[in-house]
C-alpha cells in the first residue's frame, strides 16, 4: 500500500506539472483564435472585466489527464471507460464552445441537442456497468452497514435497483455533468471544488482496490490543481463547457464504476446546491413572479450580497472538504 500511495502522489504531481507545461502552450493559441468569453450583462458588474478572457481551457485539463493516466502504467478496462466518459462529455462541451466562441453563434448547441448527447453517453456507461460489474444493478447506500430498518421499511447496504438501474444512473450522470457546468462561474471555483472531490475518489478507490481508477482520479486532481495556476482570480483562461462537462463526466464515471453513485450528491454537494438554486429560482419566478435568490446560480447570489469573488470560492472549497470528510465516514 505504501508503494501504491506513493504512485498516487506521483500521479498528482505529474498531472500538476504537465498542466503547468501545457498552459503556456495552449493559452496563447486560444488568444490568437480570439475565443474570448462573453459575460452576462445582467451579472455582477465586476465580471465585465472578464470579457474576452480565453475559454475552451478545458483542453488543457483533458490533455493533462490523458497523458498522466497513461504514464502511470495501470491501464485496464475501467480506466478506458473513465477516460472515454471524460473525453465524450468533453467533446460535447467542445462542440458547444466552438459554436459559441469560434462560429460566433451565441446559443451554441440547443438544449435538446446537448441533453440528447449527454443521455446517449450516460446510457452507454450505465449499460456497461450493469453488465460488467459483479454487483450488477446494485449500488452501495452510504451510512448503511448491513441494513437499516426504519419502521417497517428496511434499507439494505447493497440496494438492487433492477430495471430502474439504467434510468437512475443516467439521471445521476447527466445531473452531475450539468451541475459541474453551472458551478463553473467564478475564477477557480469548479476546478478547485473538483480537485477536492477527485482527491476523495482517488483515496477511496485506492482503499477499495481500484488502482486504475485511483490513478485516474489522482490525474484529475493534479490537473485541476495545475489549472488553478491559470484559472484562479484573476483568471488567464476559463475551462469552458469543454472542461466543466469533461470534469463532470470524469467524476460521475468513477462513482458509477465503483458503485457509489449515491455518494456524489454528498461529496459534490456544492455542484448540486448550484443546480438546485437555478431550479428553485426558475420555479419561484414562474409561479410567483418573485426570485428566491438575488441571482442564480448560488455563487452569484453571494457575490451580489457583498461577498468578494475569492471569498465565495474559498468558502465553497472549505464546504467541499467537509462534505468529502462526511462522505468518507459514510463509506467506511
Curated annotation (Swiss-Prot):
Pathway(s) per entry: Cell wall biogenesis; peptidoglycan biosynthesis
* Ranges in coiled-coil conformation: none
Question: At the top level of its lineage, which domain of life is listed?
Answer: Bacteria
Q: Which cofactor does it need?
A: Mg(2+)
Return one Gene Ontology term, BP aspect: cell division
GO cellular component annotations, sorted alphabetically? Answer: plasma membrane
Record keywords, A-Z: Cell cycle, Cell division, Cell membrane, Cell shape, Cell wall biogenesis/degradation, Magnesium, Membrane, Metal-binding, Peptidoglycan synthesis, Transferase, Transmembrane, Transmembrane helix
Name the chemical reaction catalysed here. Answer: UDP-N-acetyl-alpha-D-muramoyl-L-alanyl-gamma-D-glutamyl-meso-2,6-diaminopimeloyl-D-alanyl-D-alanine + di-trans,octa-cis-undecaprenyl phosphate = di-trans,octa-cis-undecaprenyl diphospho-N-acetyl-alpha-D-muramoyl-L-alanyl-D-glutamyl-meso-2,6-diaminopimeloyl-D-alanyl-D-alanine + UMP
Q: Please state the Enzyme Commission number of this protein.
A: 2.7.8.13
The cross-references to PROSITE patterns, in alphabetical order and at most eight, read: MRAY_2
What EC class does the entry list?
transferase
Instruction: Recall the GO molecular function terms of this protein's record.
Output: metal ion binding; phospho-N-acetylmuramoyl-pentapeptide-transferase activity; UDP-N-acetylmuramoyl-L-alanyl-D-glutamyl-meso-2,6-diaminopimelyl-D-alanyl-D-alanine:undecaprenyl-phosphate transferase activity
**Where, by residue number, does the polypeptide cross the bilayer?**
9-29, 55-75, 79-99, 115-135, 155-175, 196-216, 253-273, 312-332
* Membrane topology, as annotated: Multi-pass membrane protein
Question: CDD domains per the record?
Answer: GT_MraY (cd06852)
**Main location per UniProt?**
membrane
- Subcellular compartments: Cell membrane
Pfam families associated with the record: Glycos_transf_4
Q: Would you identify the family this protein belongs to, as annotated?
A: Belongs to the glycosyltransferase 4 family. MraY subfamily.
Task performed by this protein? Catalyzes the initial step of the lipid cycle reactions in the biosynthesis of the cell wall peptidoglycan: transfers peptidoglycan precursor phospho-MurNAc-pentapeptide from UDP-MurNAc-pentapeptide onto the lipid carrier undecaprenyl phosphate, yielding undecaprenyl-pyrophosphoryl-MurNAc-pentapeptide, known as lipid I.
Protein's name according to its UniProt entry: Phospho-N-acetylmuramoyl-pentapeptide-transferase
Q: Which organism does this record belong to?
A: Alkaliphilus oremlandii (strain OhILAs) (Clostridium oremlandii (strain OhILAs))
